[in-house]
């Protein structure tokens, strides 16, 4: 009799995705981040569900309800901080996952890559809306500043912003709809993640060498299940260390002050994982130009497959491209630092140089160096 695992319609899907899946024998720890993102998403949905049981999306009570969760609800504090820091872990894994894709040429799988970009946008939107919910100072002013960017769109901008706000300023209507969207989006992300996997399993995984691994496959279980479990344990170790020892390390002290439309905080800034994009936005003195640069800073990923000029897929055997890649990483870290600094000299010029360098590396230097490397191999 054939194993039920291979015949039952539901079990068969699980089996072909996580058990009998043929996987390359040489994929490194950089391939762990997909499963870690899945764990982060499940963790965020679960902690978020328990938070939603006690949270009220009303301007008068939102801040108090979060305080109530932390003070009065059984283990409410740990649920709240796991959710807040879980978002940080989510983005760390996301950046590593995208970085891996760039380094090893995973973007050659176009459908998988493009759905990944949609997932990135959806996750960023969800995180932004979630940051508004505690209704602290940074929640309110962050929501005001970021939604206001849409007013830069010609002709329809102002109407669009007021439509999103549900009024003439960020208020009760805005908070209620942000809560509704923040609740539904993770489920949309989960559905998209399944489509992401569906397209990945059409082609099979890439591997560090960038060479086809069809002749050397191993079953996903037990080799990569045990490897994923190790990754998950390390993720939980880092997350729980953060939650239990310094839960507010990555947060903003301003968000412990209730939202006040009459008092603007000295430095409005988003969570750390948006600072690189925020720095790019601020580095352009024109409002519409800044918004376009902000959108393009992420959307540029969609152009990467068309800018791939190398004869090799991976950067594993391309030392010049490797140098550029790590320069890009350093540049993104610089942008992240600048995004958290006040708009004054010398931070303005550093941010502008770093922003120009970011687009130059991706659009000009990477394709050029790849062509040079191709020519160096003709000997």
Curated annotation (Swiss-Prot):
Amino acids binding a ubiquinone: 201
MF GO annotations: metal ion binding; ubiquinol-cytochrome-c reductase activity
Keyword RNA-binding appears in the UniProt entry: no
Signal peptide positions (record): none
PROSITE patterns the UniProt entry points to: CYTB_CTER, CYTB_NTER
Protein name: Cytochrome b
Note: Heme 1 (or BL or b562) is low-potential and absorbs at about 562 nm, and heme 2 (or BH or b566) is high-potential and absorbs at about 566 nm.
Keywords of the record: Electron transport, Heme, Iron, Membrane, Metal-binding, Mitochondrion, Mitochondrion inner membrane, Respiratory chain, Transmembrane, Transmembrane helix, Transport, Ubiquinone
Coarse class of the protein's main subcellular location: mitochondrion
Similarity comment: Belongs to the cytochrome b family.
Gene: MT-CYB
Reported cofactor(s): heme b
Higher taxonomy: Eukaryota, Metazoa, Chordata, Craniata, Vertebrata
One of the protein's GO biological processes: mitochondrial electron transport, ubiquinol to cytochrome c
Originating organism: Canis aureus
Entry superkingdom: Eukaryota
Cofactor note: Binds 2 heme b groups non-covalently.
Gene Ontology cellular-component terms listed: mitochondrial inner membrane; respiratory chain complex III
TM region positions: 33-53, 77-98, 113-133, 178-198, 226-246, 288-308, 320-340, 347-367
């Amino acid at each position: 009799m054939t194993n039920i695992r291979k015949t039952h319609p539901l079990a068969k899907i699980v089996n072909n995705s996580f058990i009998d899946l043929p996987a390359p024998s040489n994929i490194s720890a950089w391939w762990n981040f997909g499963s870690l993102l899945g764990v982060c998403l499940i963790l965020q949905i679960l902690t978020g569900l328990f938070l939603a049981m006690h949270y009220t999306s009303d301007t008068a009570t939102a801040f108090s309800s979060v305080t109530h969760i932390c003070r009065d609800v059984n283990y409410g504090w740990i649920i709240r901080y796991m959710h807040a820091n879980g978002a940080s872990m989510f983005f760390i894994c996301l950046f590593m996952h995208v970085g891996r894709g760039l380094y090893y040429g995973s973007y050659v799988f176009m459908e998988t890559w493009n759905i990944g970009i949609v997932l990135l946008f959806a996750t960023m939107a969800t995180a932004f809306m979630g940051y508004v919910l505690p209704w602290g100072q940074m929640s309110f002013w962050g929501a005001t500043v970021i939604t206001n960017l849409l007013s830069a769109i010609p002709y329809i901008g102002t109407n669009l912003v007021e439509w999103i706000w549900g009024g003439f300023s960020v208020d009760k209507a805005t908070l209620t709809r942000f809560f509704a969207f923040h609740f539904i989006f993770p489920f949309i992300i989960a559905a998209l993640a399944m489509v992401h996997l569906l397209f990945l399993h059409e082609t099979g995984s890439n591997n560090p060498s960038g060479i086809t691994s069809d002749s050397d496959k191993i079953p996903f279980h037990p080799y990569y299940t045990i490897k994923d479990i190790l990754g998950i344990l390390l993720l939980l170790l880092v997350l729980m260390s953060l939650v239990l020892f310094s839960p507010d390390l990555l947060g903003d002290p301003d968000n412990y002050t209730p939202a006040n439309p009459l008092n603007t905080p000295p430095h409005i800034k988003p969570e750390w994982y948006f600072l690189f994009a925020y720095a790019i936005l601020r580095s352009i003195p024109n409002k519409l130009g800044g918004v376009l640069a902000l959108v393009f800073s992420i959307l540029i990923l969609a152009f990467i497959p068309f800018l791939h000029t190398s004869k090799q897929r991976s950067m594993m055997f391309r030392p010049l491209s490797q140098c550029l890649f790590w320069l890009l990483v350093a540049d993104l870290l610089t942008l992240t630092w600048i995004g958290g600094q006040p708009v004054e000299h010398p931070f303005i010029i550093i941010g502008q140089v770093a922003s120009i360098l970011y687009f130059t590396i991706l659009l000009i230097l990477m394709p050029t160096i790849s062509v040079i490397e191709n020519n160096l191999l003709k000997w």
